[in-house]
């Protein structure tokens, strides 16, 4: 550990000297070298300084590795959750003789939340009033507090009435879906409860806290 710190201090001192010489400020370079030496002596001789350095290193490791690992887990589980939502929508629409052609996007308020989600295509056609229309139209599915499908409305139709005919999937608890556990992929059918993945803006923090709590238990 001491050797590594000495190498880092030497590299920082060398860089500081180069910067100081480049700007014709040799005093600045000497100050950086003196600071590096004082820091090395302080780390070696004073336990309090050593403890602060260790805590800073642990915090950086936590941010870079622990939090990053939890985020990767959230990405994986969220992908499965969205795919399950899409599959559920397929089943519901099939029962109504409908299909959708579009994409799934998770949104929180007016801002999209990036979860590494696949652009899951869904086949879809508005429910025909008369004969079956073979043409499909593109629509987008948005998930906020629930997932809702709203068919396109022609100019002569009442948009509010058409929106009332949308398909709404219910929710289940956020952490049930995003707990990063072995049973995280066991989703409920759409007629029961299904999660709003974006119920909270502290998505990653909640998942991370839950993961750390299980690790400490």
From Swiss-Prot:
Location relative to the cell: Host mitochondrion membrane
Chief subcellular location: host cell
Positions occupied by motif LXCXE motif: 141-145
Gene Ontology cellular-component annotations: host cell mitochondrial membrane; membrane
Listed GO biological process terms: symbiont-mediated perturbation of host cell cycle progression; symbiont-mediated transformation of host cell
Keyword Ion transport included in the entry's annotation: no
Superkingdom assignment: Viruses
Keywords, alphabetical: Host membrane, Host mitochondrion, Host-virus interaction, Membrane, Modulation of host cell cycle by virus
Job description of the protein: Plays a role in the modulation of host cell cycle. Induces a cytoplasmic sequestration of host RB1 at the mitochondrial membrane.
Subunit structure: Interacts with host RB1; this interaction induces the cytosolic sequestration of RB1.
Name of the protein described by the UniProt record: Protein MC007
Organism: Molluscum contagiosum virus subtype 1 (MOCV)
Upper taxonomic lineage: Viruses, Varidnaviria, Bamfordvirae, Nucleocytoviricota, Pokkesviricetes
């Amino acid at each position: 550990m001491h050797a590594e710190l000495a190498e880092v201090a030497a590299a920082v001192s060398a860089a500081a000297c180069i910067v100081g010489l480049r700007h014709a400020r040799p005093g600045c370079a000497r100050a950086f070298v003196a600071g590096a030496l004082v820091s090395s002596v302080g780390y070696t001789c004073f336990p309090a300084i050593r403890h602060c350095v260790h805590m800073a290193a642990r915090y950086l490791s936590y941010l870079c590795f622990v939090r990053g690992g939890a985020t990767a887990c959230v990405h994986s589980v969220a992908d499965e959750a969205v795919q399950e939502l899409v599959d559920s929508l397929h089943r519901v629409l099939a029962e109504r003789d409908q299909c959708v052609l579009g994409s799934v996007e998770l949104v929180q308020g007016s801002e999209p939340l990036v979860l590494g989600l696949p652009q899951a295509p869904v086949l879809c056609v508005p429910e025909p009033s008369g004969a079956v229309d073979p043409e499909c139209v593109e629509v987008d599915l948005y998930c906020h507090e629930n997932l809702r499908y709203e068919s396109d409305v022609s100019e002569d139709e009442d948009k509010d009435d058409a929106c009332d005919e949308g398909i709404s999937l219910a929710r289940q608890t956020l952490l049930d879906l995003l707990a990063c556990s072995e049973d995280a992929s066991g989703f409920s059918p759409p007629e029961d409860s299904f999660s709003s993945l974006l119920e909270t803006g502290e998505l990653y923090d909640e998942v991370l806290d839950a993961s750390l709590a299980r690790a400490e238990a």
